[in-house]
Amino acid sequence: HIHVVKRGDTLSSIAAMHDALPAFVAADNGLTLSTPLVIGQALVVRTPKTLHTVRAGETLSSIARDYDLSVRTLLRRNFFLHGRELLREGDVLAIDYADEAPLGTLGVNAYAYPYIGGELLDSVLPYLTYLTPFTYGITPAGVLAPLDDARLLERAARYGAKSLMHLSTLTPEGNFSSENAAALLQNDRAQSALLAEILQTMAKKGYYGLDVDFEYVPPELREDYAAFVCRLREALNAEGKPV
């Protein structure tokens, strides 16, 4: 349901109107229970069909098993958990929701810097198909710039999101380099070296696929860039990895 706030509405009154829980309405809309509402504000309100009150000794895994669900699905249906798997006795979980038939499938990718906060990362991972650590830069000679992506890859695997390796021309100064792109695209030996290192890195770290992000490529090199991406795709597809 979409509820438009009227004068006198509170989270509690809105939740009661839709047979929902105030804490769920708050979490699903990025609010806290003490956040003041504004007249005309639109809120998403979901009506739980089945609720489960956590008992002593229960875990997210045990509850998911009891209802024949995956932990990932249970986390998705309880955004207020923000991805945390540690439950407290008395927590109320939504097992399913009324009138929520699947509409289809959707693939969702998110980019993350290595320094992203753990709480924010864990809160979104249950909803992601892919997580892409940002970013592996390159030198003109076709050498990958290192990326401290171990934590991101570990969290992605824990929450069932596939990891994509991000290849770009971003420099340590934070700018996309046309010069680095041009040097690489006109040097077959550098491309071969880069391709070999990409394959090695993906195999070592367990990356699912590759995301190529070269920005500000000179117009006269557009065909060289297309050929380079085709070369990457051919080599990685042979290893079962998408580009």
Q: Language-model segments: which ranges?
A:
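Primarily a LysM-type cell-wall glycan-binding module
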Residues: H1-D19, Q41-D68, D91
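Soluble periplasmic/extracytoplasmic beta-strand elements of cell-envelope proteins
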Residues: H3-K6, A42-R46, T53-R55, T73, ...
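Solvent-exposed, polar/charged alpha-helical surfaces in well-ordered, non-transmembrane soluble domains
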Residues: S12-A16, A23, S61-R65, R72, ...
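Short acidic beta-strand-loop surface patches of small beta-rich interaction domains
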Residues: A26-S34, L75-G83
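Short, structured interface segments
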Residues: N29-T47, L86-A98
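Boundary/entry segment of secreted carbohydrate-active catalytic domains
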Residues: K49-H52, I95-L120
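Flexible loop residues that form catalytic
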Residues: F79, A98, Y136, E215
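Chitinase-like catalytic core of GlcNAc-active glycosidases
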Residues: P102-P114, L125, T139-V243
